Amino acid sequence: GVSDAAAYGVNGTAELADAIRTVKGQNIYLVAVVSTCVDTLMAERYAATAQQTASGSAYTDSSGGWVDPYNTFTRTYLVSLCKELRELGFDEVAFSYLQQPLAAAELKYAGQTGSPSRTDAVVALAKYLRTSLSATGLRVSAIVSADSILQEKAKLSGQDMTVLPKLFDRVCVFAT
């Protein structure tokens, strides 16, 4: 597992270190996919990290439990996790779920005055991650959904395709 995830009780059961050493020994480029805004265990175990609806309840949907992109704990955890993945031997991280839910529910954000847009929330997190990881030598990419970047859904997902390609080494479009 990854020690930071284990420390918070949100890690999986796989022990990666030996497998990574074996693969790296074969000179294979490794990419870790890191879910940014959907983390059911984090949202359940650390309620303060959960994305909230306008009524104050934790937001969940078929993707799982969502975490607040402005939450300091969430941001620090993501950066720490990525740095640890780099130390394990990963060459790149690709952020999945770097978006907001596609449902029309109104969302509240931690420590934010006013009502930032979903795009503001996603771009703020993307900039934070990019800046925080820039000195690591780790390539940083984003995975976006073809559905969520369509004009009518882009405002809901917050995935601004005029900004994300400027922040990341590559943007991968996941076609559904």
Language model: regions and residue ranges:
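Active-site-adjacent "subsite" loops/lids of carbohydrate-active enzymes
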Residues: 37-83
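Generic structural signal for well-ordered alpha-helices
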Residues: 16-21, 82-83, 123-130, 161, ...
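Aromatic-lined carbohydrate-binding/catalytic grooves of carbohydrate-active enzymes
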Residues: 1-13, 109
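An active-site-proximal structural segment forming one wall of the substrate-binding cleft
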Residues: 65-98, 159-165
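Active-site-proximal loop/short-helix segments
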Residues: 40, 46, 91-119
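Soluble non-cytosolic domains of exported or imported proteins
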Residues: 10-14, 68-76, 116-123
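Aromatic- and acid-rich polysaccharide-binding/catalytic face
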Residues: 142, 157-176
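Aromatic-lined carbohydrate-recognition surfaces of secreted/lumenal glycan-active proteins
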Residues: 29-39, 94-95, 116-158
